[in-house]
């Protein structure tokens, strides 16, 4: 094998991919600027995550965020990184972060046309034990001519123009969903670029894995209890489903996307409105899943149809392979009819 054969000289970077998509759509290039800036933050967070122990970034920063979670030092660093790079992209006007109580309004001289909702470091309760964590983001167009405000972020997920997540695992991967589908990019540390590795990703119609925190079993809705029982003891004597639950949404959803199956964080007696946040956790993941051919629901309605009233609103979420999610929805309907 020659050196040339071992080295791809026509690689598709994320920048090239987005520029090509933008050219097809005759865009202004602002989305490319925005995603390039986001990639810079993801690379920096990836580096910080990998050297967190040496740099003393583990542990608690000594406060809680707006939704009551303890803030870790890496959370603070990641949040500052994402905010600063998005502001300096000159493509955003409103930012919503899990870590900030109020929406961040970008300075007039730096404003663009996009609204970005993000969780800078999802799964951060797992940082200290080295479990995979990630960054989640959803991008909307500002849909009014008024001065930018928090209201610009209160759009249903159907209005998303792009969404995705970065996974800091055995490698750093960025999964990007846009109008034409879902594509996966791997960070090549040798050249510092995200390289397209999976084009137009589609989830399996039916999987063989279910993912839920069964520690809440006594609080579950009867429909969830029945569904899990069916997966463990199939009435048709087929092979039971495997159970996998990491406790880091990015890791659990990415596994579901790759292998198929179902991920559930439903409402329960303790959290009747669900626990995960709609704008920067549920909506982006639901958008990715639907663009990959899957389904995402609360059990009563499509996640992407919810019109938010608060930037930190919570929602139940069930997503995954269409046949698996449909089976659970049928059980919900059966119980609702009783």
From Swiss-Prot:
Cofactor: Mg(2+)
Function: Catalyzes the hydrolysis of fructose 1,6-bisphosphate to fructose 6-phosphate in the presence of divalent cations, acting as a rate-limiting enzyme in gluconeogenesis. Plays a role in regulating glucose sensing and insulin secretion of pancreatic beta-cells. Appears to modulate glycerol gluconeogenesis in liver. Important regulator of appetite and adiposity; increased expression of the protein in liver after nutrient excess increases circulating satiety hormones and reduces appetite-stimulating neuropeptides and thus seems to provide a feedback mechanism to limit weight gain.
Record-listed E.C. numbers: 3.1.3.11
N-acetylthreonine modification, residue list: 2
Entry's family note: Belongs to the FBPase class 1 family.
The keyword Metal-binding appears for this protein: yes
Catalytic activity as recorded in UniProt: beta-D-fructose 1,6-bisphosphate + H2O = beta-D-fructose 6-phosphate + phosphate
Binding residues for substrate: 122-125, 213-216, 244-249, 265, 275-277
UniProt-recorded name of the protein: Fructose-1,6-bisphosphatase 1
Annotated positions of the N6-succinyllysine modification: 151
Residues that, per the record, bind Mg(2+) 2: 98, 119, 121
GO terms of molecular function: AMP binding; fructose 1,6-bisphosphate 1-phosphatase activity; identical protein binding; metal ion binding; monosaccharide binding; RNA polymerase II-specific DNA-binding transcription factor binding
InterPro entries membership: FBPase_C_dom (IPR044015), FBPase_class-1 (IPR000146), FBPase_N (IPR033391), FBPtase (IPR028343), Fructose_bisphosphatase_AS (IPR020548)
Species of the source: Sus scrofa
